[in-house]
């Protein structure tokens, strides 16, 4: 305690001594009426994350001499005149003189001893002006508070000072506003980027309080959230070193105030704030057009390449150029390249500009004369656009206006896709709750709930995810007469952010699951359970779920679902696992084989698809079985980044009324003694379809058949026995771009674009004679991530370009035998995967007499062995029975 008090006393004495210097009138870092000579050095180093890299390979150093004259002073105010001379830049031992910096001085005004404005010539380039702001910011040293905010070249920053001695001070900067200037970003953390920044400034003063040395050291780490070892590390130092006192006489401006002194300069100069502006030249795209890049990529953009990483990589390379392309140019490309139209409309959806939107609709939509092929392409465009994270508001307004036109009402599928896209884009736009557009879209969708097709609007509300619609969805979930309405409403509610629900909502979900007021479809009950569990159940609620397992409810498939869901959560969360075990031990009537050995075929599981050094991806599979037949199933691919996760793709299958075709699941030789669940509806229509969600955007569902007549047509005609594409598209995944201003004034530009190309196809074989069926679903995915970083100023630049390509594939085979009892065997397989990573770091000396460039390349690859995923013991037993004679 005594040592601590001594340390505090020492700090206070140092601070008092330092403040004493300030009070004695020796506050100026540059002595009034004097000339001081300094040397300025700025070094910027770019390193690749994940491996050792020599700083000398990708770095530059800028050096110059500064002559600082104090040309006006009064009280604590001062005007400094700064001349830059003898400038040079060096990279990899190659030094180049800079002769283009004008010999005109710039000025720094100081108010109460602190830099306030930069007065510079209007013709100077942006990066040089930023450098001048950086020089001025190094003179910002204040000790009137231990922690506060300061405005300097990096914007508004939180700062704190640490007085080391009477002549040495350390300043720490945090959370500067210009360290994260976002242009585009993905709201899903797992699909975003992570940035860490810090800066420390060291000051050394003379015994009189004048500046001898100022040194800024800042670090910026930029990486993919889902793959932290991929990205860049930028280090920058800015050093101002006092050399000597100048010998020239400093002519003073004989004016009565600082404002008048500044005013006298404004014939040729302008006044600028300390806060920097982005130097747009750092992100300027080379002289290349979208048409040139498209022609160079045509071989990778063919329909046969869908599902391959080569197409995804070509796709993301086109995005930056496409975002600066005009409508007329898009129209020409659509006309000239008809052979790759499907890929072009995917691209234009990802562009998210009004020019791309107008070109697409102008080319494809002909109102009543629109052909079926054009309608398909328009739907494809809308599906790509629906994944957009920063759509132009005018696009949303145009699509919403289309819904009122009579011509589009005749194209039912297109109209539904427009509704789903409008809902998704409205959510992605992040509109204020009082925004008129949000209110109009919400009102339109809520009115649709009373139409003849309420499920369409319920799906749209799922995409909108507006908390103001929760009550309406809950009402449909609890009072809807048709089972599919309750299921759709709960499926929509499950998509909402967890923070949208309150305790009243939780009670209503419990009421649905436990059927306290009425009976509900089994899918509605399992969806309600999912929401309750995602809201983190209390100890009492968990105990109630365990007690339910031993209840007399005869819906054994739901009990199986509950048990598997609880076990899955226990595997993932240590806290929940401890709670689960403690509650289970308390219940002897539950903790026995009779209850825990549930009889159902329903399966809930999660499996690791890949992990570091590849991406951390898991598969979440839910197969809800009814009378031995798959009633509702889903396979969802989740990308993880720390504690956050994002759904990259979700495939759902739903069926109804198929039990009559396969007979009684309990008849037979007794191999499959599964008691039938309670009947919910005896006259259920025979239907089946597919639901697809891409990065949380629910697409228009695909209906396989509706009615027994249509089903039997497929059975006898064998129309589903050949592999048929169900979904083929390339969509944007990562879409992040932002700028950082370094203390030296150099601009850093970072852009990360990612795409996923998906080819989903399947086939079904059905034999009433042999009483069996076979289903095969194949998903081929090609993903690519392209990163670009550039940092520098007019005369030097560092660049890093990296790419990651990956082709994860998955196949699901299901064999159903209902010749004697019902036996269902599912096999989930993943073939070998290869992840490739390339990286190129470059240094450029430019706008000098002899330009210089150097490139450093590296590659990395990682193989993941193929495997067949274990599902559960019941599935293993079924597979052994079906294939015992093979």
From Swiss-Prot:
Example GO molecular function: lipid binding
PROSITE patterns in alphabetical order: VITELLOGENIN
Signal peptide positions on this chain: 1-27
GO biological process, one term: synaptic target recognition
Places the protein is found: Endoplasmic reticulum; Golgi apparatus
Glycosylation sites recorded in the entry for this protein: 358, 484, 502, 616
Keywords, in A-Z order: Endoplasmic reticulum, Glycoprotein, Golgi apparatus, Signal, Transport
GO CC, one annotated term: endomembrane system
Principal place of residence: endoplasmic reticulum
SMART domains in the cross-refs: LPD_N
InterPro entries (alphabetical): Lipid_transp_b-sht_shell (IPR015819), Lipovitellin_superhlx_dom (IPR011030), MTP_lip-bd (IPR045811), MTTP (IPR039988), Vitellinogen_b-sht_N (IPR015816), Vitellogenin_N (IPR001747)
Reactions this protein catalyses: a 1,2-diacyl-sn-glycero-3-phosphocholine(in) = a 1,2-diacyl-sn-glycero-3-phosphocholine(out); a 1,2-diacyl-sn-glycero-3-phosphoethanolamine(in) = a 1,2-diacyl-sn-glycero-3-phosphoethanolamine(out)
Record-annotated Vitellogenin domain positions: 30-653
Function: Catalyzes the transport of phospholipids such as phosphatidylethanolamine (1,2-diacyl-sn-glycero-3-phosphoethanolamine) and phosphatidylcholine (1,2-diacyl-sn-glycero-3-phosphocholine) between membranes. Required for the assembly and secretion of plasma lipoproteins that contain apolipoprotein B.
Name of this protein: Microsomal triacylglycerol transfer protein
Organism: Drosophila melanogaster (Fruit fly)
């Amino acid at each position: 305690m005594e040592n601590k008090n001594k340390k505090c006393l020492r700090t206070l004495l140092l601070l008092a001594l330092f403040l004493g210097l300030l009070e004695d009138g020796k506050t100026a870092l540059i002595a009034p009426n004097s000339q001081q000579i300094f040397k300025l050095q700025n070094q910027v180093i770019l390193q690749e994350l994940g491996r050792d890299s020599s700083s000398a390979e990708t770095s530059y150093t800028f050096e110059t001499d500064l002559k600082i004259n104090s040309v006006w002073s009064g009280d604590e105010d001062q005007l400094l005149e700064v001349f830059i001379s003898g400038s040079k830049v060096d990279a990899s031992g190659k030094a180049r003189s800079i002769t283009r910096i004008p010999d005109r001085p710039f000025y720094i005004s100081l108010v109460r001893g602190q830099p306030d404005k930069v007065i510079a010539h209007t013709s100077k380039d942006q990066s040089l002006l930023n450098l001048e702001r950086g020089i001025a910011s190094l003179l910002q040293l204040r000790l009137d508070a231990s922690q506060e905010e300061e405005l300097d070249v990096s914007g508004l920053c939180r700062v704190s000072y640490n007085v080391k001695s009477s002549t040495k001070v350390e300043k720490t900067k945090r959370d500067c506003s210009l360290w994260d200037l976002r242009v585009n970003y993905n709201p899903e953390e797992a699909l975003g980027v992570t940035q860490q920044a810090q800066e420390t400034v060291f000051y050394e003063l003379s015994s009189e309080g004048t500046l001898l040395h100022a040194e800024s050291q800042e670090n910026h780490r930029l990486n993919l959230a889902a793959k932290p070892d991929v990205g860049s590390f930028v280090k920058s130092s800015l050093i101002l070193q006092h050399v000597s006192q100048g010998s020239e006489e400093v002519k003073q401006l004989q004016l009565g105030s600082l404002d008048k002194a500044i005013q006298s300069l404004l014939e040729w100069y302008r006044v600028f704030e300390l806060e920097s502006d982005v130097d747009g030249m750092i992100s300027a795209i080379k002289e290349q057009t979208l048409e040139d890049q498209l022609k160079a990529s045509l071989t990778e953009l063919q329909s046969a390449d869908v599902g391959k990483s080569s197409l995804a990589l070509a796709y993301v390379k086109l995005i930056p150029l496409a975002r600066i392309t005009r409508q007329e140019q898009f129209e020409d490309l659509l006309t000239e390249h008809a052979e790759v139209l499907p890929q072009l409309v995917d691209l234009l959806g990802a562009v998210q500009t009004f020019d791309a939107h107008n070109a697409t609709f102008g080319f494809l939509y002909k109102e009543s004369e629109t052909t079926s092929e054009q309608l398909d392409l328009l739907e494809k465009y809308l599906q790509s656009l629906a994944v957009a994270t920063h759509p132009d508001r005018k696009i949303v307004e145009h699509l919403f206006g289309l819904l009122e036109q009579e011509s589009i009402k005749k194209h039912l599928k297109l109209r539904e896709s427009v509704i789903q896209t409008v809902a998704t884009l409205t959510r992605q736009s992040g509109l204020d709750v009082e925004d008129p557009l949000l209110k109009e879209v919400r009102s339109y969708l809520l009115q649709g709930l009373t139409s003849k097709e309420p499920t369409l609007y319920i799906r749209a509300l799922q995409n909108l995810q507006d908390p103001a619609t929760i009550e309406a969805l809950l009402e449909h979930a609890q009072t809807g007469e048709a089972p599919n309405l309750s299921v759709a409403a709960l499926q929509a509610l499950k998509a909402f952010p967890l923070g949208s629900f309150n305790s009243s909502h939780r009670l209503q979900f419990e009421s649905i699951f436990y059927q306290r007021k009425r009976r509900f479809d089994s899918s509605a009950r399992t969806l309600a359970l999912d929401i309750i569990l995602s809201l983190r159940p209390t100890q009492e609620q968990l105990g109630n779920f365990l007690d339910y397992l031993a209840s007399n409810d005869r819906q054994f498939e739901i009990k199986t679902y509950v048990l598997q869901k609880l076990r899955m959560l226990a595997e993932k969360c240590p806290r929940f696992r401890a709670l689960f075990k403690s509650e289970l031990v308390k219940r002897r009537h539950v903790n026995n084989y009779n209850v825990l050995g549930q009889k159902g075929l329903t399966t809930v599981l999660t499996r690791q698809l890949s992990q570091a050094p590849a991406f951390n991806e898991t598969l979440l599979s839910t197969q809800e079985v009814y009378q031995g037949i798959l009633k509702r199933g889903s396979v969802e691919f989740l990308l993880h980044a720390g504690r956050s996760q994002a759904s990259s793709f979700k495939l759902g299958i739903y069926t109804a009324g198929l039990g009559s075709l396969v007979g009684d699941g309990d008849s037979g030789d007794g191999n499959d003694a599964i008691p039938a669940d309670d009947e919910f509806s005896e006259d259920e229509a025979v239907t089946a379809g597919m639901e697809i969600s891409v990065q949380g955007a629910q697409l228009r569902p695909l209906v396989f058949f509706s009615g027994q007549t249509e089903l039997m047509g497929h059975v006898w005609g064998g129309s589903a026995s050949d592999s048929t594409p169900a979904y083929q598209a390339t969509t944007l995944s990562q879409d992040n771009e932002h700028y950082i201003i370094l203390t030296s004034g150099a601009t850093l530009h970072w852009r990360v674009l990612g795409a996923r190309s998906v080819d989903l196809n399947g086939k079904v074989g059905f034999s009433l004679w042999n009483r069996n069926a076979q289903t095969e679903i194949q998903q081929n995915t090609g993903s690519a991530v392209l990163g670009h970083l550039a940092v520098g100023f007019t005369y030097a630049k560092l660049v890093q370009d990296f790419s990651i390509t990956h082709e994860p594939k998955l196949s699901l085979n299901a064999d159903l035998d209902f010749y004697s009892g019902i036996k269902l065997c599912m096999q989930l397989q993943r073939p070998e995967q290869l992840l490739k990573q390339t990286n190129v770091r470059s240094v450029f000396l430019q706008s000098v007499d002899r330009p210089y460039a150097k490139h450093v390349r590296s590659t990395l690859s990682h193989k993941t062995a193929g495997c067949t995923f274990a599902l559960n013991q019941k599935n293993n037993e079924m597979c052994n029975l079906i294939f015992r004679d093979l």
